[in-house]
Amino acid sequence: MPLPAIDPAEYASQLADKVTQFKHAFTPFAVPEPTVFPSAPLHYRLRAEFRMWHDGERIDYAMFDPAEPKQPIAIEQFDIAAEPICAAMPRLRERLRASETLKRRLFQVEFLATLSGELMISLIYHRPLDESWEAAARELAAELNVQLIGRSRKQKIVLDRDWVLERFALDGRPLQYKQIEGSFTQPNGGVNRQMLGWACEQVRGVGGDLLELYCGNGNFTVALAPLFDRVLATEVSKTSVEAAHYNLAANDIGNVAMVRMSSDEISAALARTREFRRMKDVDLDRYRFSTLFVDPPRSGLDAPTVELARGFDRILYISCNPQTLQENVAALQATHGIAGAAVFDQFPYTRHLECGLLLTRRGGPRAP
């Protein structure tokens, strides 16, 4: 994680610059005025990781400037981190400094917090962990009231559980999400909640069935599923699929079929060019897809997935990379136009911008 330059007084102007760049980039596609969802200027980041810098008996959190990658910068406080992380950082450092067992060859510390106040800390070592470490770690976890995990090469010690439970309300509806250590979770919880709300508004009243690619732990699936008759969701990560199944059950979602497949594979399955054992319990003939939802990696949609998308009347696209989003929109321009747009400032004080587009078929929906 790079060291950001943080000045809350500059936040609004920095966001305005990013929005201007977004609008300029998508002007050739007649993008409507985007809805802008800002971040809180401080305490917005639910994930943080630090190298641990040892100097004699002293140990400190450290980050590195890309311009001087070998020179550590000691971190006394980290105001962009969520408040549970900020509160735990000095207490954890004190306990590490006081315990040779806990600090010896400690290489890195990772924090994962939730909007609902839970916190998980992973301590990563360059040595095997033994019973004495586990005893000291249990005392530390109890004192800090956190989930604590120890890692070293080919070793993982989970003292209680390796996940936290996120809880928040969306349009008055209480939601909960299991977030597993080491798997992808949204870094900016406040902005994520705004993304979910915007996505729901784009498809409210549409009905029909939804195909979702890259569903992760079900972040959007849980929010969107009640707005559709049926949902077919795909994801390749085993841990994310496990979390998604938990999250669907925990939120009483019963209209989602989930399969562990890549976008290439589901494209082939829908085109009936390949059969997959993983699809044996899914009757594709029952689905009447009205909408495709995608939240792909930075590389965007590959050519087969773009071809798949052309067959949908509505494409709801969340992107963490406006450049590949531009490329995909250009590839779809002959069949789809932009009907709605939003920008989500997941990463304040950086050049990165999350964005969302609603693409609809030119000339209206196809006849059923």
From Swiss-Prot:
The keyword tRNA processing applies. Keywords: Methyltransferase, S-adenosyl-L-methionine, Transferase, tRNA processing. S-adenosyl-L-methionine binds at residues 186, 214, 219, 235, 295. GO terms for molecular function: rRNA binding; tRNA (uracil(54)-C5)-methyltransferase activity, S-adenosyl methionine-dependent; tRNA binding. The active site is at 320 (nucleophile), 354 (proton acceptor). It is an enzyme of class 2 (transferase). GO terms for cellular component: cytosol. HAMAP family: RNA_methyltr_TrmA. This is tRNA/tmRNA (uracil-C(5))-methyltransferase. It comes from Aromatoleum aromaticum (strain DSM 19018 / LMG 30748 / EbN1) (Azoarcus sp. (strain EbN1)). The lineage of its organism: Bacteria, Pseudomonadati, Pseudomonadota, Betaproteobacteria, Rhodocyclales. The gene is trmA.
